[in-house]
């Protein structure tokens, strides 16, 4: 018999997970000396990285992708990413910006 899950319990569980994620935001050099912002530490099994990347790209007006368990954004967006992730429900105290 399949386990019946209350949708409200599942939503609360996801909110608690969001608040416990340790997220690291840093910049890497890409091709031709360009910069890219890397966001690591979001559990890709529990959260849709593609959806989070899509929201961040729209807010930051930049290109990017979600691959290998991390989000890559074109350009240096470290200063704004922390605030935007907090707006999406992630704990601001657990977001480390380098």
UniProtKB/Swiss-Prot annotation:
Cleaved signal peptide residues: none
One Gene Ontology MF term: translation initiation factor activity
Keywords of the record: Protein biosynthesis, Translation regulation
GO biological process assignments: formation of translation preinitiation complex; regulation of translation; translation reinitiation
InterPro entries linked: DENR/SUI1_TIF, SUI1, SUI1_arc, SUI1_arc_bac, SUI1_dom_sf
PROSITE patterns named among the record's database cross-references: SUI1
Family membership noted in the UniProt record: Belongs to the SUI1 family.
NCBIfam families recorded: PRK00939.1, SUI1_rel
The protein's name: Protein translation factor SUI1 homolog
